[in-house]
Swiss-Prot record:
This is 3-deoxy-manno-octulosonate cytidylyltransferase. The gene is kdsB. Activates KDO (a required 8-carbon sugar) for incorporation into bacterial lipopolysaccharide in Gram-negative bacteria. Transmembrane segments: none annotated. Keywords: Cytoplasm, Lipopolysaccharide biosynthesis, Nucleotidyltransferase, Transferase. HAMAP family: KdsB. Belongs to the KdsB family. Its EC number is 2.7.7.38. One of its GO terms (biological process) is CMP-keto-3-deoxy-D-manno-octulosonic acid biosynthetic process. It holds the Pfam family CTP_transf_3. It comes from Pseudomonas fluorescens (strain SBW25). CDD domains: CMP-KDO-Synthetase (cd02517). It catalyses: 3-deoxy-alpha-D-manno-oct-2-ulosonate + CTP = CMP-3-deoxy-beta-D-manno-octulosonate + diphosphate. InterPro entries: Cytidylyl_trans, KdsB, Nucleotide-diphossugar_trans. Its main location: cytoplasm.
Length: 254
């Protein structure tokens, strides 16, 4: 049976590394439109863009997306989702999928998968996905978030650092990917129950979240179990920098 869920796409205009990121053109479309189109191809009952900027609202109206204007002072995309869940009147047990607004190549199957994974793992209050890291440059890239899970597929931690650090292997060959270590790249997509979002906001950011700039660490800090599935179809990395934007444009022939 198909899992019922709502997709919310948090989208901020301000970006330190790429100002105006959601409205950057890829071909003849703003990036936020490509993300929304991919989300609409999933099994979601509803797809909503959540933004703090009227310019993004106007752009969304131009291509037919439902968009909600939120406060500007949210600490993370998940905090923004909590406001939207309240405005939409979502039931506490409703599944909400957070699709990052800078993932224009995200496969619809991945969106469906993370929603289904949350529904299937009652011990987890959040679900997300990962894929193997297969080259040393990706492993050492701080824009690539690494994740380590336990034997039950629950997250132990996330970091922008090389995680885990293969002490002996790197001492011998510091520029070679160690064999036998299942390094994984975290894919920035989350599923949660709407009721959990309100708990998340009430906790406020923790120092670890602020240090790494990774909102999921707030959940781990408070003992929340996060299920990490192996993505059936992994997207290319999202858009964080001007170089990333050019990479996506090349991939799409734009």
């Amino acid at each position: 049976m198909t899992t019922a869920f709502t997709v919310v796409i948090p989208s901020r205009y301000a970006s330190t590394r790429l100002p105006g990121k959601p409205l950057q053109l890829i071909g003849d479309k703003p990036m936020i439109q490509l993300v929304w189109e991919q989300a609409c191809k999933s099994s979601a009952e509803r797809v909503v863009v959540a933004t703090d900027d009227p310019r993004i609202i106007e752009a969304c109206q131009g291509f037919g997306a439902e968009a909600v204007l939120t406060r500007e002072d949210h600490n993370s995309g998940t905090d923004r989702l909590a406001e939207v869940a309240t405005k939409l009147g979502l039931a506490p047990d409703a599944i909400v999928v957070n699709v990052q607004g800078d993932e224009p190549l995200i496969p619809p199957s991945v969106i469906d998968q993370v929603a289904a994974n949350l529904a299937a793992h009652g011990e987890a209050r959040m679900a997300t996905l990962a894929e193997p890291i297969e080259d040393i440059a990706t492993l050492f890239n701080p824009n690539v978030v690494k994740v380590v899970s336990d034997i039950n597929g629950l997250a132990l931690t996330f970091s922008r650092s090389t995680l885990p650090w293969a002490r002996d292997a790197f001492a011998k060959q510091p520029d070679v990917l160690p064999e036998g270590v299942p390094y994984r790249r975290h894919i920035g997509i989350y599923a949660y129950r709407a009721g959990f979002l309100h708990d998340f906001v009430s906790w406020g950011p923790c120092w670890l979240e602020n240090t790494e700039s990774l909102e999921q660490l707030r959940a781990l800090w408070h003992g929340v179990r996060i299920h990490v599935g192996d993505a059936l179809e992994a997207p290319p990395a999202g858009v964080d920098t001007p170089e990333d934007l050019e990479r996506v444009r090349r991939l799409l022939g734009a």
